[in-house]
Every structure is written in structure tokens, then in C-alpha cells.
């Protein structure tokens, strides 16, 4: 389990997270949602170890991440950032295989693992292409393939591993949004855990087990999608009155932007 205990973060002298506590269990997808500037990405960076909290602590499978060496942390969780700028002319294959540096293992298997990761994100046949030649959505999927190479097994040495994804479907068409979300769900079904920053509330409702809703650096609601996505919380957090509906056959809430009033 990833556990954040009362963490606060200060950036440039301003406190941006105020006492955040959350548990992200293996076998489950935790989605962090909220308006722009609410602290979602900062929370993900804090639980990944990229940012050091000014107060509180984060543990992964019971170990304080502050006590882990970078290579140890790299074996326990993989991180997909919001965007990645690469200035050098790397091929897709070279980018994806960077994820294998933490894994070790037989070098002879690296090509197969990279090809499997590219196939999983629907980029089979792209390995020889230059990264800069790809569309934004294709680049995003290349980076996810790299993360999958790093954390290729959801469970290793008897411990769950985690994918930390910052807006993993923001640049994708609907088909590939579903592909990536189903891939994340399968990672959970196989024993790993996923924490994802999300903006699409309908995709979040379809795939997440737990929603953590943030506003102004604080958690305003948490729980199952049907408990968090309510008319009241939507208005309180996003500042617009909106009707949350439920599909009768599946008991999954969905939000129609057409119903919003400002």
C-alpha cells in the first residue's frame, strides 16, 4: 500500500498542500480529481518521492520513501509525468528501453519486453520511429510503454508495485483512452496498484475504485465514485451547479456538462 500521512508541501514559500492523508491499496485504482491548481500533481509528486513534504510522510509497502535509494524506489513504482520534453533524436525503441535500466535481468529479453510494452499501448511497429516525429498522443503512449517496462510485473518478490500516472489520457482519442484505462485496470487485477490524476470524470467513474477529490490543496471528498460524484460535491469543488446522473444498468454515475450552470 502507498500511504500518505498528513503531508504538507511548500513551493516557492507558498503552502500548496495542507495535511493530505490518503491510502492507495494494491488491487485498486485511486483517482485524484479536482479543478486546475487544486494540488493533484503536487500530491502525486509527493507520493512518488519527486517532492519532499515539508511535513508528514509517505510510505510504500510499509517503508518510508525517504529511506529508499532512487534505484530501490524505481523497482517499486513507475511514474508517468504530465509531459516529457526530449530534445535529442531518440527512437521510440531507445525511449522505451530506458525503463529497463532499473529492472536488470537478461539483456537478451529486453527487446521482447519493450515490444510487448509497445503492443500493450497500441504502438506495435513504431519502435524505429523518432520520438519527435510522433503526435502528442503517440508520445504519451511511448512514455507509458517506458513505465510499463520499468514496472513490468504488478507483483515482484511478493510485494505489489505501483503505477503513478499524471493525466495518462489527456492527449488521447477515445479508443486509446479506453485502451490505457483498461490496461491500468488489468494491472490492478493482477495485484498492483494505480494512482492516477484525472480530469475526465466519466472515465474516472467507470474505472476507479476510489476517488480523492481535491480543492485548494486539501481533500474535500473521498470514497467510491457514487459517493463522491454528487451534485453537492461537484458544486462545492468545481464551482458550477451540475446534475450527476446514474446509468441504471451499471449504477455508475456520469456527468453531463450540458446540465451545468455557472
UniProtKB/Swiss-Prot annotation:
Stated name of the protein: Hemin import ATP-binding protein HmuV
Family, as annotated: Belongs to the ABC transporter superfamily. Heme (hemin) importer (TC 3.A.1.14.5) family.
A cellular component term, taken from the record's GO annotations: plasma membrane
UniProt EC number: 7.6.2.-
Molecular function terms, GO-annotated: ATP binding; ATP hydrolysis activity
Location of the ABC transporter domain: 2-241
Annotated organism of origin: Rhizobium meliloti (strain 1021) (Ensifer meliloti)
Entry binding sites for ATP: 34-41
Complex and partners: The complex is composed of two ATP-binding proteins (HmuV), two transmembrane proteins (HmuU) and a solute-binding protein (HmuT).
Membrane-traversing stretches: none
This protein's record includes keyword Cell inner membrane: yes
Keywords: ATP-binding, Cell inner membrane, Cell membrane, Membrane, Nucleotide-binding, Translocase, Transport
Membrane association type: Peripheral membrane protein
Amino acid at each position: 500500500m502507498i500511504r500518505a500521512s498528513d503531508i504538507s508541501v511548500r513551493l516557492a514559500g507558498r503552502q500548496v498542500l495542507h495535511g493530505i492523508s490518503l491510502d492507495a491499496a494494491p488491487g485498486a485504482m485511486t483517482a485524484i480529481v479536482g479543478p486546475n491548481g487544486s494540488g493533484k500533481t503536487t500530491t502525486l509528486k509527493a507520493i512518488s518521492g519527486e517532492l519532499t513534504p515539508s511535513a508528514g510522510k509517505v510510505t510504500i509497502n510499509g517503508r518510508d520513501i525517504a529511506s529508499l535509494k532512487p534505484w530501490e524506489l524505481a523497482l517499486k513504482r513507475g511514474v508517468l509525468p504530465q509531459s516529457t520534453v526530449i530534445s535529442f533524436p531518440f527512437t521510440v525503441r531507445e525511449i522505451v528501453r530506458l525503463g529497463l535500466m532499473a529492472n536488470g535481468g537478461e539483456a537478451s529479453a529486453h527487446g521482447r519486453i519493450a515490444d510487448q510494452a509497445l503492443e500493450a499501448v497500441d504502438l506495435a511497429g513504431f519502435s524505429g520511429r523518432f520520438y519527435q516525429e510522433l503526435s502528442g498522443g503517440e508520445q504519451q503512449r511511448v512514455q507509458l510503454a517506458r513505465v510499463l517496462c520499468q514496472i513490468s510485473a504488478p507483483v515482484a518478490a511478493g510485494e505489489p508495485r505501483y503505477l503513478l500516472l499524471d493525466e495518462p489520457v489527456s492527449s488521447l482519442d477515445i479508443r486509446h483512452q479506453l485502451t490505457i484505462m483498461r490496461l491500468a485496470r488489468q494491472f490492478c487485477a493482477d495485484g498492483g496498484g494505480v494512482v492516477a490524476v484525472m480530469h475526465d470524470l466519466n472515465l474516472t467513474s467507470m474505472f476507479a475504485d476510489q476517488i480523492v477529490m481535491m480543492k485548494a490543496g486539501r481533500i474535500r471528498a473521498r470514497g467510491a465514485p457514487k459517493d463522491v460524484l454528487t451534485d453537492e460535491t461537484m458544486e462545492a469543488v468545481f464551482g458550477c451547479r451540475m446534475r450527476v446522473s446514474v446509468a441504471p444498468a451499471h449504477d455508475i454515475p456520469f456527468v453531463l456538462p450540458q446540465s451545468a450552470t455557472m
